């Protein structure tokens, strides 16, 4: 998405996007708006009530819900993906393979907190069992972690968390009120096959 939005670089002409979250749909919309054909979005989830998948439906982008990519083909570059439907419990694939021609496969697994500097400074991590990522737990230094490095990814929640934690850290009582509008996003889902 950054290549096409910031630099105007098209990495492929026929794209398949594989995802477990709504953020990939923003990539699909960006590519579509720049003239790139989205062959399909392959989503392991059974559905999403987010705004971005709805927008992709409006644009006529094909969404394969509760599917996964099981194989790719190509020589020196990708030219095809094989897709299969997931079983009800997500433990296996079912039905026949669907083969989709493409010259680019985009993969979106969601967000992971950027904890590199935190751990380099001696900070300890904890694992979030619900969202499947490590995030800051404790540190011996006088520091705070907010936003994506703390596992907060919604813009509204990042601003609220930043204000609350900064005020606590600096012993401030003043609160600014911000009016933040963001699109509705569906949940992400992890899978282990």
Task: Identify what each model region corresponds to.
Residues 1-193:
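Residues forming the flavin
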